[in-house]
Amino acid sequence: MSVLLPALGPRLVFFTGGTALRGLSRSLTRYTHNSVHLVTPFDSGGSSAALREAFALPAVGDIRNRLAALADSMIPQSVLDFWEMRLPAEGDSEALRARLRAMGSAGHPCWRPLPSVMADVMRVHLGYFLERMPDDFRPQKASMGNLLLAGGYLHFQRNFTPVLSLFSRLLQVRGVVLPIVNACLHLAAELADGSVLVGQHHFCRLTQPVRRLYLTVHEPGRTSTALTPCRPPLSATAATYLQSAGAICYPMGSFYTSVLSNLLPDGVGRAVAAARCPKIYIPNSGKDTEAQGLTLTAQVDMLLRHLQQDAPQAGPGDLLHAVLLDSRHGRYPGGIEWKELERRGIEVVDREMVCPDDPQHHDPERASVALLELVEELRARERVPEAGTAVIPEEDA
């Protein structure tokens, strides 16, 4: 692998969510400061649920998590600790709301460990949130980073661009993080028995195969099967990053909620098909509760099918070039059907990158090096041409 200044490293665009990619994201900052993380904003569980119910906004938890993963190593630990700090999971709601209001004061002890400029910016954004906090807001286990992002998003008229730009500079984020769409939607699934699930947090308890995956404006808890599917447009900023990508990666992570959900907005499949760069899938190793009953080959087929719903004229070779896996240490449902994957025109690339003593997890350093090496190899063999550059517009992400 060529050794480059990270500032000149390749633009790797990930469809991602959750925490599975956190380690690899962190490791990648040693090699490139130009990775782009298109994050799913559809989470409906935990403290995200309280924010979404109160303000009807996209979920910000996965965005917060990825910003922290890409933060420069020289950022004071006290800043990251505050960013990731949570209120207690138990306790009286009014007492916890009072605690939050007290933290809005410049004299509160929570700000003392932080550099003054960083403390000021964070306190201002907490103030934006407190100005709008409903009297019945449920603050249990609330993440401070989530509250700051929500406050900025609301202050800037529901525009992610200013608040993400500001906190990316504050944390010296070595990459780009943005939601795949700016819309308050929920993930839904029609199961094989005809039942319907609404809400990402329900996907960890799938009892039937998923027949159809879609987005909806309906909130979790709705039991009617008459749900209205919604296909929001891919943001123009995300589309431009895809257009100018040095590589596109469908990485490890919960199959439906972290990977496929990002492919549902209108325009994603077409943008991927048009991008002139390597396109790589890194499947999960070990058990993914969301992908029960799906072999590795079936996962590849489902990935392609969701992309082709938006780009029906695209063939497999327009959407996916290689599957990057570890046959020695990895554990893949149904095994590795080499010939079946190659019959689809997809190259199977074998690299040691799964932890030998823990097949559930990839070694972040080995996985990042394997990915970067594969991108270089595909370019060198002219498997796909290298993308050019593009100016990224400033717009409502």
Regions found by a protein language model. Give the residues of each.
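Conserved catalytic alpha/beta core of Sir2/sirtuin-type deacylases, generalized to analogous enzyme cores
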Residues: 1-12, 19-37, 45-46, 146-249, ...
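Electropositive, gly/pro-rich neighborhoods at or near active sites that engage anionic ligands
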Residues: 42-216, 388-396
